Regions:
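Short, acidic Ser/Thr/Gly-rich low-complexity loop/linker segments typical of extracellular
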Residues: 4-20
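Surface-exposed loops/turns
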Residues: 17, 27-28, 54
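A short, solvent-exposed beta-strand micro-motif common in secreted/extracellular proteins
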Residues: 27-39
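Structured interaction patches on ligand/partner-binding surfaces of diverse proteins
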Residues: 38-60
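Conserved "repeat-terminator" motif of extracellular CCP/Sushi domains
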Residues: 57-70
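Periplasmic OmpA-like peptidoglycan-binding domain that tethers envelope proteins to the cell wall
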Residues: 112-218
Length: 218
């Protein structure tokens, strides 16, 4: 609980086993309430105690989503062919990821980057590592603690899956599938390669504290 207007010191409470909680709040004020649970993303809301009486009860529910084990796709972070430079659109997406990490301030994440299948395996692995690092560097520049971020490049080893518009089946965008369009539909050929040039993130920890970082440095 954070007192937005009155300046009262922030405090925490614990729910019961069913998730219920009760706390009297100072009247004539506004409160920012953030709910958290291990292995879940946080949720928050503001509660206004102006124009109510001491007998008024306010119900404020929170919905916490479980942190998935698999990587989470970040739609919109894409790269030009053979480049690790962030596009303007990618910067906007990373700004939203930055806000997410500021709110979920205990998460430690791995930024995963992938390439298309053109180029050697070694080159693509190095390129994807540079792409992942470019995202990490940007978030660090914005103010995220470096200890909360890891960059991991996977090269062309994990092609994306799409749903075939005709068969409605899941298709892995391997080079052998994409190459069928190289002559009959050049635009689609490039589009499918672009889908493989992507970045995602995976939560690898939810216990970050500044104290733990300081202990590692001692």
């Amino acid at each position: 609980f954070k007192d937005i207007i009155g300046g009262q010191e922030s405090f925490k409470i614990t729910t019961d086993d069913k998730g219920y909680y009760f706390k009297p709040l100072k009247l004539g004020d506004e409160w920012f309430i953030r709910a958290s649970k291990s292995k879940y993303f946080k949720d928050a809301n503001a509660v206004n105690t102006k124009s109510i009486t001491e007998t008024t009860r306010i119900r404020q529910d929170f919905r916490l989503e479980k942190i998935p084990i698999k990587e989470i796709s970040i739609d919109g972070i894409e790269y030009d062919f053979n480049s690790a430079n962030l596009r303007p659109q990618s910067i906007e997406i990373l700004d939203r990821l930055y806000d997410f990490l500021v709110f979920n301030d205990v998460l430690i994440v791995e930024l995963n980057s992938h390439t298309d299948a053109r180029g050697s395996d070694t080159y693509n692995m190095n390129l994807s590592q540079r792409r992942a690092q470019s995202c990490v560097d940007y978030l660090i520049q914005k103010g995220i603690n470096p200890s909360r971020l890891q960059a991991k490049g996977y090269g062309e080893t994990l092609p994306v899956f799409i749903t075939d518009p005709i068969t409605k089946k899941e298709i892995e965008l391997k080079e052998s599938y994409i190459n069928q369009f190289i002559r009959k539909d050049k635009a689609k050929f490039e589009e499918l390669h672009q889908l493989n040039r992507r970045t995602a993130f995976k939560v690898i920890g939810d216990n970050f504290t500044r104290e733990s970082t300081n202990n590692q440095m001692d």
